């Protein structure tokens, strides 16, 4: 895992995971995952991946977050909009990133 703020890749793909310090209604640590949606205008969203709320989609990301002709999120957009669109309770400099879960 690395800090999201240190990520240099220009795009973040479906299946990527963000680990944050949670607050109510989440556990002490919570993972969020980039998922595909069924909304053609907003094809990617963020879903809770761990704990009691696992499986809940918390946001369908806006079109400006999506990299053209791909199903990926702009890393720069996500860094600039983390607290507005994803999870304001955890500052961006404390968000951890991994490309996907490894089993």
Task: Give the positions of each predicted feature.
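Mixed-charge, Lys/Arg-rich low-complexity intrinsically disordered regions
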Residues: 1-13
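Solvent-exposed strand-loop boundary residues in beta-sheet-rich modules
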Residues: 24, 38, 50-52
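Short, solvent-exposed secondary-structure boundary/capping segments
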Residues: 41-48
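Generic low-complexity segments that are intrinsically disordered, proline-rich and/or Lys/Arg-biased
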Residues: 11, 26, 44, 63-64, ...
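Short beta-strand-centered aromatic/proline hotspots
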Residues: 26-39
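Tryptophan-anchored aromatic micro-motifs
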Residues: 14-23
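Intrinsically disordered, low-complexity, charged/polar segments
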Residues: 52-103
């Amino acid at each position: 895992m690395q800090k999201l703020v240190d990520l240099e890749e220009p795009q973040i793909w479906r299946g990527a995971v963000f680990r944050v310090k949670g607050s109510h209604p989440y556990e002490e640590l919570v993972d969020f995952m980039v998922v595909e949606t069924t909304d053609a205008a907003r094809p990617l969203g963020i879903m809770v991946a761990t704990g009691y709320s696992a499986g809940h989609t918390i946001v369908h990301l806006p079109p400006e977050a999506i990299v053209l002709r791909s199903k990926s999120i702009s890393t720069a957009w996500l860094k600039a909009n983390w607290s507005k669109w994803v999870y304001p309770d955890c500052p961006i400099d404390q968000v951890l990133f991994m490309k996907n879960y490894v089993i």
